[in-house]
């Protein structure tokens, strides 16, 4: 274990730890995917272990499921849970209206299904993920492998009529082969640079034959928790306008690392 966490890991831990404070005994939770969400799973496991917190977790990817089980969190399927109290997940970008780009970890389909089956979605992120306009991060689109090149052409044609600055579309690879999602689909990354109007773009993409889902999360996120490299953390709620500022005890992060043997 490093003597000190990097500023980026400090920020991710701070956001994750504050978000896990929102979890109550008996909740059914959506467990996100990605490096920040992995911190959340670790923090949740700490509460389960130390407080006897009883929760059920619905993971949004195979790797999140494996981590949650390894740390002692009860894992169930969404069909078993049926509906969730809260989902906590990361984001690749978010704007002032809490519109998101997600899918950098190729789990966007399960992430969106789980988030929309929840009473509340809380996004955890470091401060660098907040942007004035979405689009600097490539927008992932999950597509069926059959005819994916035709689907790509249809996406490129659709982008011609959209308020975006870039229109390059690339197939995401794993080594020399197409990356496969948990559902055995492909990911096309849309390099748009700036998205002027996310909502019509999201609707248009999902009308294209061969598109399974896109990484724009519109009207899904309720709360954003932002961590900073010095341990400060802010919580912002969209509907209530609530804004809280605080800080996190970083010794707890080091304890989590030590307990996990990292």
Curated annotation (Swiss-Prot):
Protein name (database record): Ribose-5-phosphate isomerase A
Look at the named UniProt entry and state the broad enzyme category this protein falls under.
isomerase
The organism named in the record is: Cereibacter sphaeroides (strain ATCC 17023 / DSM 158 / JCM 6121 / CCUG 31486 / LMG 2827 / NBRC 12203 / NCIMB 8253 / ATH 2.4.1.) (Rhodobacter sphaeroides)
Q: What InterPro entries does the entry give?
A: NagB/RpiA_transferase-like, Ribose5P_isomerase_typA_subgr, Ribose5P_isomerase_type_A
Q: To which pathway does this protein belong?
A: Carbohydrate degradation; pentose phosphate pathway; D-ribose 5-phosphate from D-ribulose 5-phosphate (non-oxidative stage): step 1/1
- PANTHER family this protein is in? RIBOSE-5-PHOSPHATE ISOMERASE
What EC number(s) are associated with this protein in UniProt? 5.3.1.6
User: Which residues participate directly in catalysis?
Assistant: 111
